[in-house]
């Protein structure tokens, strides 16, 4: 069922981590989850105008403050001139949440292989009347050139402004959806065009994770088995017991 389930949710706790990293119990959980969504919507809406290229937002909570990590392709657009933009953003989030908010901006080194940024770039081009085939093929070429091992892009809707909606997809490389150790980045973006909404789905395969760790664990287990066998032989294991049970032949 790897083709049906969400690629990120399928790998949570194994090679993927949650974007809301905090713990609580009781009815407060629902309120905090809702507040996290409000924070993400506000940050994405505000920074979308600046074309900052926000790939993801990670929220961490303590009893006193909220820490927001913004992963952006253009961190300068988030910080602003002399830090004005990030200070205004912090003050506005303080007002919304009622708590002290700390913002850290992390630069995305390779935005060409981030599924969210690829989807937003295609949506931006479609909204500006660029051919969807050209936008998809160009994004695939850039991702493969940047080091992706596989990519698949699917667009659905009134493509090209036709009357009947349809879907088209382009793929290059491999996308192992059922392999849990495969680092598959996924994003879903909506482009609002004159003809209507167009859904964009992006899968990017960045390689395998945990391969070295799995090999190390297997090697450690094999080493324990070898040490156990050597210890049994040194103390007189099964072979020694068989030798002791043999009685010498009576030569008399």
UniProtKB/Swiss-Prot annotation:
PROSITE patterns: KH_TYPE_2, RIBOSOMAL_S3
Keyword Ribosomal protein: yes
Signal peptide: none
GO molecular function, one term: rRNA binding
Job description of the protein: Binds the lower part of the 30S subunit head. Binds mRNA in the 70S ribosome, positioning it for translation.
Annotated family: Belongs to the universal ribosomal protein uS3 family.
Subunit organization: Part of the 30S ribosomal subunit. Forms a tight complex with proteins S10 and S14.
Name of the protein in its database record: Small ribosomal subunit protein uS3
